[in-house]
Amino acid sequence: MVRPRRAPYRSGAGGPLGGRGRPPRPLVVRAVRSRSWPASPRGPQPPRIRARSAPPMEGARVFGALGPIGPSSPGLTLGGLAVSEHRLSNKLLAWSGVLEWQEKRRPYSDSTAKLKRTLPCQAYVNQGENLETDQWPQKLIMQLIPQQLLTTLGPLFRNSQLAQFHFTNRDCDSLKGLCRIMGNGFAGCMLFPHISPCEVRVLMLLYSSKKKIFMGLIPYDQSGFVSAIRQVITTRKQAVGPGGVNSGPVQIVNNKFLAWSGVMEWQEPRPEPNSRSKRWLPSHVYVNQGEILRTEQWPRKLYMQLIPQQLLTTLVPLFRNSRLVQFHFTKDLETLKSLCRIMDNGFAGCVHFSYKASCEIRVLMLLYSSEKKIFIGLIPHDQGNFVNGIRRVIANQQQVLQRNLEQEQQQRGMGG
C-alpha cells in the first residue's frame, strides 16, 4: 500500500485543481449513511475503510439534493449525492497510477475512430480514513457514460465512499479534453479487472466544472452496483447505432429513461380472407426516473399478437398488479399509423417472450391511448397466472374465429 502522506497545498489559478488566491471554506460531511459494511457470507468483502480518531472529516459536504452535473451546477450531484468544494490540503495520498480512457476524434476525422488518452493521477482520502489500495492495478481503464443513464442508480450512489482524484498536469490537451467531456454531462466508470485481487470492482468518477475537481465514488454494495452498471452499459450499446453513432435522441422521452431497444414484430389482418401481413418497427422501452428494469436478458426482437380487448376482461385483476413502461416506435410512419388505427379500434398487443430467453418475463401487454398518443406496456407481476390466463384467452379467440368463419360459409351457401 502506498504510504499516506500529506497532499501539497495548491493555491493560485494554475491547473484545473488550483484555487483562486483564497483558501476555501472548511467543509463538513452530513447526511451520509453509515460507513459500516454489512457482513456477507459469500463473495469478496467490500473495501475496508478504517476510521481512526481524527477531527471531523473535511473536504466534502453531502447534501440531499438531486440534480444534473454540469457547468452550472454548484457541486457534484447524482442520485441524491452532492459533493461541494474540496481542497487537497489535509488529505492523504491513497493511490498513484495512470488513468486511461477513449474519446471520439474531432468531427472532421473518422467518426468511428477513438483516441486513446492517458494521464498520471492520484487518489486522495480524508484524514482518519484508510482506503486499501495496495491491490489496485497501476492502470485504471475508464469508460465514459452519459450521466442521464445513471439516475436509476441513485440509492447505490448515496451509499458510497468518496475519494478525490487529482491529475498531474503534464498533458494539457488530454486534461482539457477530459474536463470538457465530463463537464458536458458524462461520468467515468472504472471497471477493475477480475484478475485483480482487490475488493473494489467498480468506481465512478464525477467532475464539477465550477469547482474544478474530480470526485471518485466507491459504492459499498459492489456486486449490486456492478450488475446495475452492466445493465446501463448494455442499454447504452443498444441505443447506439452502427459505429458507435447515436441513432437519435432516444435516451430520454418525457423525462423517462431508456431501458431497452430492439424490434417489435406482429401480423395484421389483410382485406383478403385468412390473409395477414407481417409488420415490424424499431422500438424502445422507457421507465420512470429512479426505476430499474432489468432488460439485459431481453431478446432483440419481440413478437406481438393482436387480441380484441373485450376478451381480456377476465384478466383485469392481474392487469391491476402490473408494472408500467412506455413504448416508443420510430421510423416507418405508415406502419405506425396502421398499428395505432388497429389498437384504437379495440385491440391490445400480447408480447410473448421466447422460452429460450433467460429473462424472468414471459409476457407483457401493450395498450394504446389515442387521446395521449402513447403506447403503454403492462408487465404483470404474477407472470405464471397471467401466462395461463392469456393462453385461455387466445384459445377462446381461435374458437370464436372458427365459429365466425363457419357462420360466414353457411350464409354464403344459403345465399347461393
Swiss-Prot record:
Query: Which residue ranges are recorded for the region named Disordered?
Result: 1-53
Subcellular compartments: Cytoplasm; Nucleus; Cell membrane; Cytoplasm, Perinuclear region
Provide the Gene Ontology terms for cellular component.
Answer: nucleoplasm; perinuclear region of cytoplasm; plasma membrane; transcription regulator complex
> What are the protein's UniProt keywords?
Activator, Cell membrane, Cytoplasm, Membrane, Nucleus, Phosphoprotein, Transcription, Transcription regulation, Ubl conjugation
Q: Which Gene3D superfamilies match?
A: Mediator complex subunit 25, ACID domain
Modifications the protein undergoes after translation, according to the UniProt entry: Ubiquitinated by the CRL2(KLHDC2) complex, which recognizes the diglycine (Gly-Gly) at the C-terminus, leading to its degradation. Ubiquitinated by the CRL2(APPBP2) complex, which recognizes the Arg-Xaa-Xaa-Gly sequence at the C-terminus, leading to its degradation.
- Please list where the region (Interaction with FLOT1) is annotated: 184-416
Locate the compositionally biased regions of type Gly residues. Answer: 12-21
Please report what switches on or represses expression of this protein: By testosterone.
Q: Bias category Low complexity: which stretches?
A: 27-36
Q: Name one GO biological process term.
A: positive regulation of transcription by RNA polymerase II
Give residue numbers for the modification (Phosphoserine): 53
Instruction: Read off the InterPro entries from this record.
Output: Med25_PTOV (IPR021394), Med25_PTOV_sf (IPR038196)
Give the UniProt tissue specificity note: Expressed in brain, heart, kidney, liver, placenta, skeletal muscle and small intestine.
Which family does this protein fall into?
A: Belongs to the Mediator complex subunit 25 family. PTOV1 subfamily.
Q: What does this protein do?
A: May activate transcription. Required for nuclear translocation of FLOT1. Promotes cell proliferation.
PANTHER family from the entry?
MEDIATOR OF RNA POLYMERASE II TRANSCRIPTION SUBUNIT 25 (PTHR12433:SF11)
Q: How does it assemble?
A: May interact with CREBBP. Interacts with FLOT1.
- Designated name of the protein: Prostate tumor-overexpressed gene 1 protein
